[in-house]
Amino acid sequence: MDDIVKQAMAKWPNVPHCYSWLGLDTRGNWYMRDDRTQAIGSFASGMPGAKGSMLKHEKLIDFIERNYGVDAQGCWYFQNGPQRVYVELEATPFVWRVDAQGAISSSTKQTASLVQVYMDERGWPYLHTSLGFGLVHTQDVASLAEALELWHWPIQEVRAAELPQRFGYQKSPALMEKNK
């Protein structure tokens, strides 16, 4: 976490949290969601326009990724100065990039080591790593296949609906907050 963010948190400790304004899709892209977008539907609803506007400003994306974390309830957030902005996840908290030699990095540009490979009933591959759990980027499925063969990584089957509970993350912190 950036020092300037830590300083802002200390200076203004009671800023309310923000929900539904930021989303992470299955390809590791960040989306900003205004009130109008949120009214269309949830981030993962599949409704046209519900994701919002994809962020393209590299420095903003880097700032989000440096200050991306998780709370005790498994809700992922971006610490924006003193305000915690909870992230709506289309699938998982991380999107993994994999090369043919088995090197793993997150969409947040952190390297990780493999714990286990999973595949759901749709054929979607996931990795449990030293950093956490996530979906493999669609562009890296072929590289994952090469790494599986090279390193003899075993694949464990899993049901997609069981992933959040099994790996301790919330896809929609806003929904969790609403149901309190």
Predicted regions located by residue number:
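Long alpha-helical, hydrophobic tracts
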Residues: 1-55
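Acidic surface patches and DE-rich sequence motifs
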Residues: 14, 25, 34, 71, ...
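Residue-level detector of beta-strand structural context in well-folded domains
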Residues: 20, 74-76, 115, 125
